[in-house]
Amino acid sequence: LTFRNVHNWMGGGYADQAFEEFYAALKPGGILCVVEHRLPETASQDPRGSTGYVQESYMKDMAKRAGFEFVASSEVNANPNDTADHPFGVWTLPPSSGLPEDGSEEAIDFEPELYKNIGESDRATLKFRKPL
C-alpha cells in the first residue's frame, strides 16, 4: 500500500522506477494498492505532479508499464467537493491548509477557512495485481 506518494515520485522523476520496484518485490499474484490525490481526467496532468494531484489514468498507465494488471478501484476516499483547482494545489486543503513557503503576495489574500469546508482531497484508491 502506498498512500499519497505518487505525486512526490513524479516530482523526483522516479515514478516509473517506483512502480517497477514494487513489481519486482511482489510475488506473482501480489497486490499493490495506491491511494493518491485525484486529478479529474478533464484537467491537464503535470508530469511532475506539482499540484499534488494525479489522474487515475496516469497512475494506471504507470502501473501497466511496470507489468501490473488493474483489478479494481474504490470510492472510499472520494470527496466530490474537491475540484482539485486550488491556489496551492492539494496543500491548500486540510490538514495542511498551507500557504506558499516563499511568502509570495498571493498568500496575503488567502483565506484557509474557505477551503476547510471542502475537507480533505478527493483521492483515488486503486488496486493492482502482479500477474500469476
Predicted ranges, named:
Residues 1, 23, 46, 79-96:
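Flexible, surface-exposed loop/gating regions in the mature catalytic domains
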Residues 52-73:
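Short alpha-helix
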Residues 15-28:
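A short glycine-rich, Lys/Arg-flanked "PGG" loop and its adjoining helix->strand segment in the class I
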Residues 5, 37-41, 76-78:
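Short "lid" loop at the C-terminus of a central beta-strand within the Rossmann-like core
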Residues 84-132:
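Core SAM-dependent methyltransferase catalytic element
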Residues 15, 66, 122-124:
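Envelope-exposed proteins and targeting segments
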Residues 1-16:
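A short SAM/SAH-binding and catalytic strip from SAM-dependent methyltransferases
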